[in-house]
């Protein structure tokens, strides 16, 4: 399997592996009330299947990609990716992640965020990577800070579609 391995200074070694058909079970594992509390709640099975299809189709790294976060022993720890989005007066990259509870609090999400920033930056397509965690989600905001993002300020984005979410805008220079 193709993968990229990253080791951070004090963060755990992780692998970012390309999204495959087998990762549908990982997507379902992240679709719990606890994991989606700050994202509008769990999705229906139909929505999960649609998301999985979109993740599989996002295969041009310059436009973005979704990746499984894997531990050195192969265990799936979560999901991360980056994709293009319109923002302010142009296009930029956005990132988002979800790490399973058993792997939370160990630096896995921070390592994954740093790794995905390197991947996005290697595309040399956009100058910034943005993250938009809910203002009410201290863990995701802390991950942004630890991964080197700069807090721009509070904003509102539409997520999930049809809902406006109050979030912090974090930006990382690529």
What does each model-found stretch correspond to?
Residues 35-54:
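Conserved GNAT-fold acetyl-CoA-binding loop/helix
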Residues 1-38, 66-174:
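Acyl-donor (CoA/ACP) binding surface of acyl/acetyltransferases
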Residues 45-50, 58-60, 112-113, 160-164:
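Short C-terminal domain-edge/linker segments immediately following a structured domain
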Residues 55-68:
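A short helix-loop-beta-strand connector motif used in the catalytic cores of GNAT acetyltransferases and
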Residues 49, 53-57, 100, 121:
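Solvent-exposed, non-membrane alpha-helical residues enriched in polar/charged side chains
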């Amino acid at each position: 399997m193709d993968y990229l391995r990253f080791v951070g200074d004090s963060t755990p070694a992780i692998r970012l592996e390309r999204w495959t058909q087998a990762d549908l079970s990982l997507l379902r594992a992240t679709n719990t009330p606890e994991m989606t509390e700050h994202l509008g709640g769990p999705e229906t099975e139909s929505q999960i299947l649609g998301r999985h299809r979109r993740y599989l189709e996002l295969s041009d790294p310059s436009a973005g990609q979704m990746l499984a976060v894997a531990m050195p022993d192969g265990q799936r720890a979560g999901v991360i990716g980056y994709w293009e989005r319109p923002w302010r007066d142009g296009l930029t990259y956005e990132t988002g992640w979800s790490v399973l509870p058993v792997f939370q609090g160990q630096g896995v999400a921070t390592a994954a965020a740093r790794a995905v920033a390197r991947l996005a930056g290697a595309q040399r397509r956009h100058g910034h990577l943005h993250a938009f965690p809910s203002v009410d989600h201290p863990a995701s905001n802390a991950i942004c800070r630890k991964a080197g993002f700069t807090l721009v300020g509070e904003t509102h984005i539409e997520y999930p579609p049809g809902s406006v979410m109050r979030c912090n805008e974090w930006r990382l220079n690529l």
